[in-house]
């Protein structure tokens, strides 16, 4: 129970307004990452047209960037990049000798085995016979759910 007036349906309720964004640095970081994602999506679509990949999860994205603000940002969020780009793997090459601000993006077909649950391509699947065909991440997620 929540005090106060309510609409007839939750779908008619209004979201509370926010005066200011609390962490402007975080917002700036994610805006830059979304710009990179736009470039990655263009490269993915090009390789899809060339029939190199089918879905984006069937791809490995290789990014080469200079050692600077963008390079540091990509390194900081490295573990989240495959989920952000919806690909199986991201290979990051930060080059201190590269003076160009250009981002080099290369898309290749992913190798390895396809997880039956998340459809990512991984080097090996779990060895647990009760979770056959799953990557370790999915096997762990199912174990957490069962034991919770």
Each model region followed by its residue ranges:
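Acidic, turn-prone loop/beta-hairpin segments
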Residues: 1-43, 47-67, 91-94, 98-106, ...
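A glycine-rich helix N-cap at a beta->alpha junction
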Residues: 78-92
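Flanking scaffold residues of small Cys/His-coordinated metal-binding clusters
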Residues: 110-113, 130
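Short cysteine-rich clusters marking metal-coordination/redox-active sites
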Residues: 115, 135-138
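Basic, alpha-helical nucleic-acid-binding regions used in initiation and control of genome expression
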Residues: 118
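Short linker/helix segments within small regulatory modules
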Residues: 124-133
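Short metal-binding segments enriched for Cys and/or His
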Residues: 142-148
């Amino acid at each position: 129970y929540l005090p106060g007036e309510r609409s007839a349906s939750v779908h008619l309720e209004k979201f509370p307004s926010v005066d200011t964004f609390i962490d402007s640095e975080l917002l700036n970081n994610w805006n830059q990452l979304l710009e990179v994602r736009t470039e990655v999506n263009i490269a993915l679509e090009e390789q899809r047209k060339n029939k190199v990949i089918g879905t984006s999860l069937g791809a490995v994205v290789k990014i080469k960037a200079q050692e600077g603000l963008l390079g540091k940002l990509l390194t900081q969020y490295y573990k989240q990049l495959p989920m952000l780009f919806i690909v199986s793997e991201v290979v990051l090459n930060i080059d201190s000798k590269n003076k160009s601000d250009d981002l080099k993006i290369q898309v290749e077909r992913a190798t390895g085995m396809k997880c039956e649950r998340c459809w990512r391509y991984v080097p090996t699947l779990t060895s647990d016979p009760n979770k056959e065909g799953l990557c370790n991440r999915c096997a762990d997620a199912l174990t957490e759910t069962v034991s919770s």
